[in-house]
């Protein structure tokens, strides 16, 4: 999957003061690790929780969290946020997924009929989580964006599926078998993409261990900075709003983003969409939810644009200019 293509709308021409904050590339190695994301190629066998714990141990950090659980027998793309980065994992919570599944049919299947059934399953479907599930087993709707037959060899088929978050691939295979009248079960599953993070950029546990060892023993963090992505990458798929220096600390303290605090933003986005708030140096401040659409923001001179849901930037990284303004207004009153 490719990230959405968006245009940048400039609201105020603004510069940023070099005295506070820093571009992500200028963080020290220790800071870089604390504010990082790894796109892991999870092997078959361990659970998602286990591999996240191993990453935490390798990097010597207190926290590591994964987005989108993979069952032990499933391999593939598993985004893991490191340390402070776990605060904004929700940015990936509802991201689309792409899987490649190996299905075994319990009887002979005509290829044309199989392709027709795959076409029928595209769109909104009803699903009930399987018996062995961590969530409540109630009927729910999920969107299937595409189902493509990559290969059919006898009773085995390789199927690529692009689905909404929370869709059970195993259940789709089972239901396809039922519609075909022969029955089917899933023999193997690999996740090849989460949103626009693909297996092409995924790294292994050994890659992480080697990169950390080279930095610790030889002082070279080049490999480590390739293996770990800056936490800003967790918002790669989200519309971005760049915030003026004067508004950054208010957001760090949980305040909503108001129109006067915006320098520029990506369009389009709609009311209710997740948005990522950045400094003019390219640092991720946090993740919020749009209170108005981007077309309305273009015309706004005041009013609230987004509520702040999660903050990753440390308070005090930028000066509390909002406090000075509030105090000045209080004194003048």
From Swiss-Prot:
KW Cytoplasm (keyword) present: no
Catalytic activity: uridine(55) in tRNA = pseudouridine(55) in tRNA
This protein's record includes keyword tRNA processing: yes
Keywords associated with the record: Isomerase, tRNA processing
SMART domains: DKCLD, PUA
Residue ranges of every copy of the PUA domain listed in the record: 238-313
UniProt biased composition (Basic and acidic residues): 1-14
Entries under Gene3D superfamilies matching the protein: Pseudouridine synthase (3.30.2350.10), PUA domain (2.30.130.10)
Gene Ontology MF: a single term: RNA binding
Ranges where the record places region Disordered: 1-27
Transmembrane segments: none
Active site residues per record: 71
EC number: 5.4.99.25
One of the GO biological process terms: mRNA pseudouridine synthesis
Family to which this protein belongs: Belongs to the pseudouridine synthase TruB family. Type 2 subfamily.
PANTHER family on file: CENTROMERE/MICROTUBULE BINDING PROTEIN CBF5, H_ACA RIBONUCLEOPROTEIN COMPLEX SUBUNIT DKC1
Known function: Could be responsible for synthesis of pseudouridine from uracil-55 in the psi GC loop of transfer RNAs.
Protein name: Probable tRNA pseudouridine synthase B
Organism of provenance: Pyrobaculum aerophilum (strain ATCC 51768 / DSM 7523 / JCM 9630 / CIP 104966 / NBRC 100827 / IM2)
Lineage: Archaea, Thermoproteota, Thermoprotei, Thermoproteales, Thermoproteaceae
